[in-house]
Regions:
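Short, surface-exposed helix-loop/turn micro-motifs enriched in polar/charged residues
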Residues: 25, 89-90, 153-155
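Alpha-helical scaffold segments that mediate packing/assembly in large oligomeric complexes
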Residues: 12-84, 202-235
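Assembly/oligomerization interface modules of large self-assembling protein complexes
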Residues: 1-4
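Sequence/fold signature of self-assembling virion shell proteins
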Residues: 65-69, 103-236
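Structured, hydrophobic secondary-structure cores that serve as assembly/anchoring elements
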Residues: 6-20, 74-110
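A sequence-level detector of short, solvent-exposed, charge-rich linear segments
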Residues: 44, 48, 52, 56, ...
Length: 236
């Protein structure tokens, strides 16, 4: 997958007025790039997991026709793994979904740590990641919210190690401008699934990665795949 950061434009003279070295401005931009890269990788992995898992009926507990997200529904989703349900070690959900579970008087809401807007908590004895990834909410009739319950190594993101950055200063405008832009790539693998190059292509878009039919299940059993999903009516 290919991604990019920027362009970020600033006037070199601004750093002089602010009495800040140019290196400090580059450091701030670099930190912002690192955060955006991690966010892109996280959201892409979640979108691919939602697509692959929800394309397998045996891995989904869809109660959206009659109900919203509940503790019982989540437990029934775990049951899709049968005697291997203990292998489901992590849950991923949006913030609104998390607060619905809190509102249902779940007592084990211990927060383990927080990184930016991503919270990691404990629900049902499993580590739960709370992040507003777009793929965890789907528009429709009704709108649906999704909780992923995942095994260790459900998704593997690897850096392409081909980050290309360019800083360029240009004349010709009212003020001299410096532009910073960065390109990058990364790879993604899902446990128990393989990417269908014929269907999705060698350089997929976000939409293609989020299409379930582009992920082929290779594991002989759902128990040997990335995990399961609970789908509920977002309005309930």
């Amino acid at each position: 997958m290919a991604g990019g950061f920027g362009p970020i434009r600033y006037e070199p003279s601004q750093m002089t007025w602010l009495e800040r070295p140019t290196a400090q401005g580059i450091e701030v931009a670099s930190r912002a790039f690192a955060e955006i890269l991690l966010k892109d990788q996280l959201n892409t992995a979640i979108a691919a997991l939602v697509a692959a898992i929800t394309a397998q009926a045996a891995a989904v507990n869809d109660v959206s026709a009659t109900a919203g997200i509940t503790y019982a529904g989540l437990n029934n989703a775990h049951a899709k793994f049968g005697d291997a349900s203990q292998n489901l070690v992590t849950q991923v959900m949006q913030g609104t979904t998390y607060h619905k579970l809190v509102g249902q008087n779940l007592a084990n809401q211990q927060q383990l740590f927080q990184a930016g807007n991503v919270r990691v908590i404990d629900i049902l004895g499993k580590v739960s990641v709370v992040t507003d990834a777009p793929a965890l909410m789907q528009d429709g009739t009704p709108d649906k919210e999704i909780i992923l319950s995942l095994v260790q190594g459900a998704a593997l993101v690897h850096d392409g190690r081909d980050i290309i950055s360019n800083v360029q200063t240009n004349n010709g405008k009212e003020r001299i401008e410096t532009t910073l832009q960065t390109d990058y790539t990364f790879g993604l693998g899902l446990k128990g699934y393989t990417w269908d190059v014929t269907a999705g292509g060698k350089s997929p878009t976000d939409a293609e990665l989020a299409t379930g039919t582009n992920w082929d299940k290779t594991a002989t059993s759902i128990k040997h795949t990335a995990g399961v999903a609970l789908i509920g009516d977002a309005s309930k």
